[in-house]
Amino acid sequence: MERRNFLRSAALAGTALFIDPQCLMARRRPDIGAWRGFNLLNYFTAGYPEPFREEEFQWMAQWGFNFVRLPLSYWNWSRPGEYYEMDEHVLQDIDRAVEWGRRYGIHVCINLHRAPGYCVNPPAEPQNIFEDAEALDGCAHQWTVFARRYRRVSSRHLSFNLLNEVARVKAEDYERIVRRLVGAIRDVSPRRLILIDGLDWGGRPLLSVPDLPDIIQCGRGYQPMLISHYEASWTFGDKPMPIPRHQLTWPLDADGRHYDRQYLLQMQEHSWTPLLQQGGRVFVGEFGCHNRTPHAVALAWLRDNLDVFRQLGWGWALWNLRGSFGILDSGRDDVEYEDFHGHRLDRQMLRLLQENL
C-alpha cells in the first residue's frame, strides 16, 4: 500500500501513528528486562474478532504495566492461503492498538500467532511455511506490510514477534525461515526490534543467529503443565487428570519428581544459558495458569515463576489479561472477584503481579 493511502486511512480511523525522528538515528536498546505486561487476545482466533479497547491500555498503565503482546491470526485480515489480500479495516484496528500503546507508555509487540503457513494450534494451515515457498513468500509479504506500515514507529514503542511456538522443526529449517522474515522486515525497517520464539514451543533457543542484531528470543513459563494447564481440554483432552484437583499443590510431587522454585530456576537456566553465553537476551512471551488450577496453588506457582524471572533479569507477559489465565473475567470458581468497570477482577492476582513490577 502506498504511504499516502495509508496516512489517509489512518486519519479516517482517528489514529495518528507516532513518528519519532530521533529514534531513526539512535541505537537506544529497549530495556526488555523491565517489560511487564499481558497478552491481548482480541484477534487471537478468526471468527470471533474483537476490536482493541483503549480502556484496557489505560487500566494496564494505571496498574503499572508497560508491555502488551498481540497474538494475531492472519485469518482475521486474509482468507486462509490468500496471503496478499489484507483487510484494511482490521489493520486500522491494529494501528489504534499501536497508537494507544505509545499514548499510555506501553510497548506493543505484534505476533503472528497464526502466520501464513504455520500455527501451533489446529486447524492446520493449507500450506507449510517450512516446505512451501508460496507460504514463506506470503508470510514475508505480510511482515513487509507491517514493517512498511510502522516504519516510523520507534522500536522503543513497537516490536515484531515472527511466529508463535515453533515445534517439531529442525533448527536449521527454523533458521532459514527466521533469516528470510528478518530480512523482509529489515529491508524496510532496518532497526526494527524483532522477537523470535525459541524452538520446541519456546522451550530452547535458536543458537545459530547470533549475527542478527536487535533480536530477542522468547521463552515460556508453563512448566509443569500439570499446574499451568490443569484440565485444559486443548492439552489433556478428556483424559482423567493424574492428581485430583483437591490434592493439587505447589510445590508439587508428581511423575516421580519434586517440582518447586528450584526446579523452575534450573529448567530455565539449563535451557537458556547457551544463548546468554552468546550475549543473547531472553523475554518470557507467555506464562500463566488456567482457571481449573486451584487459586491458591496458581498464586503460589505464579509467585515462584515471577521470582525466578526477577532473579534472571527477564521481562514477562501474562497469558492473558482477560480470560481463563488472566486477572479479568477468568471464570474461576474459587475467587472472590471485585467488580471493575463491568468486569470481574482477580485483585489477589493483580497485586501479586504488581509486587513484581
What role is predicted for each listed range?
Residues 133, 137-258, 269-290, 311-314:
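Active-site region of glycoside hydrolase catalytic domains
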